[in-house]
Structure formats: structure tokens, C-alpha cells
A protein has these predicted regions:
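Short, positively charged and aromatic/hydrophobic N-terminal segments
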Residues: 1-3, 10, 19
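Active-site loop/lid in soluble adenylation, ligation, and acyl-transfer enzymes
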Residues: 24-143
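ATP-dependent phospho-/nucleotidyl transfer catalytic cores
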Residues: 102-104, 124-183
Length: 184
């Protein structure tokens, strides 16, 4: 078991307040390509532990990169702090150590949200346009996070029909996605 001090609710260098409580790393809930997620004795919080595993081509190629988990943890936490500073809510609570972070338990929406300002990559290929075209307004794309299906592209109506999100959640996702793009 891993013991750590965690502030209840909001904490850290963001001016967050709350009482400290002890938290133990409990049962593993999930293991993916890049991280493991553990429950804590407080049902509102989880501990994310970043791995050194590396994958490519939807997991077909695998390897290990020493220190990758540490870098991913640091980058993720700095990004979450930047987003919160700019009015985008996140699940970040507190960095425990170089590899682990306490996060709020949230509903996982199995969508990848892509904002494009310029035609590139799969967009250019899919629509048969030249790379590098600057769009007059950013575009938004969604893909269904499902390795077995190859993360297919879908629109908001598809996501709602599949029960992945509600109409209200779709609007919230779009609002914050464009806000993140403006922050960059």
C-alpha cells in the first residue's frame, strides 16, 4: 500500500483549499497502454500511475522506455494546471510523486476530440485536400476510442445515438475543446 497526504476537494498550488486526509492506494481498477488506475479509500478519488511501456500502431508494436511514465506524469500534471488556470476544469488533484497523481473520479467518455486549425494528416487524406491549408475557423472531429474498431471517426449525432454522450455533454465538450484551442 502507498500512503500519501491528499487534500479533500481542491488543493495544490492553484489556491485550492480543503482538509488533508491520508489516502492509501487500493485495488487496481484499470490497466491500459500508458497507465494504471487504483482506487483509494475515498470513493471520490483515484490514483493514476504512469507506466514506462510504449506502444505503436494500436498496440501492435510494444516496448519499454525508461522514465517515460515519469515524464508523462509531469507533462500531464503541468497541462492540467495550465488548463485549470485558463478556466477549463480537469480531474487533477495533486501529484503524489514523480510517477503517481491523485485525480477526481470522473465519468470516462470514450471519445477522442480533435480540433484542427490547419489541414493535415488524416484530415487531408480523408477529404483529399492539400496539407497546410489554414481554416477560416477551427474544425472539430470526434473519434470513438475503441481499438477493436480502429477508433472510427464519428459525428456528435453518432456519439449521442450510441449512448456515448448526451446532447448537453456534447455541447460542453465542444465548448471546452474550443477553449483549449484558444488557450494554446
Amino acid at each position: 500500500m502507498y500512503n500519501s497526504a491528499v487534500k479533500k476537494g481542491r488543493c495544490g498550488e492553484h489556491g485550492r483549499k480543503g482538509r488533508k486526509e491520508r489516502m492509501n492506494k487500493g485495488n487496481q481498477l484499470y490497466e491500459g497502454k500508458a497507465k494504471k488506475v487504483f482506487e483509494t479509500e475515498n470513493p471520490e478519488y483515484l490514483i493514476v500511475s504512469y507506466k514506462d511501456d510504449a506502444t505503436a500502431f494500436n498496440g501492435l508494436k510494444k516496448g519499454t522506455i525508461a522514465g517515460k511514465g515519469v515524464i508523462n506524469n509531469q507533462m500531464s500534471n503541468r497541462l492540467m494546471q495550465l488548463l485549470e488556470k485558463n478556466g477549463v476544469p480537469t480531474h487533477f488533484v495533486e501529484e503524489l510523486n514523480e510517477r503517481e497523481t491523485v485525480v477526481k473520479r470522473v465519468k470516462i467518455v470514450p471519445l477522442e476530440v480533435i480540433i484542427r486549425n490547419i489541414s493535415a494528416g488524416s484530415f487531408a487524406k480523408h477529404y483529399g485536400v492539400e496539407e497546410g491549408i489554414v481554416f477560416p475557423e477551427p474544425t472539430i472531429e470526434f473519434s470513438y476510442k475503441n481499438d477493436e474498431l480502429g477508433d472510427p471517426l464519428l459525428n456528435a449525432y453518432h456519439a449521442q445515438a450510441l449512448g456515448l454522450v448526451t446532447k448537453e455533454e456534447t455541447e460542453t465538450i465542444k465548448k471546452y475543446a474550443f477553449k483549449v484551442n484558444d488557450t494554446a
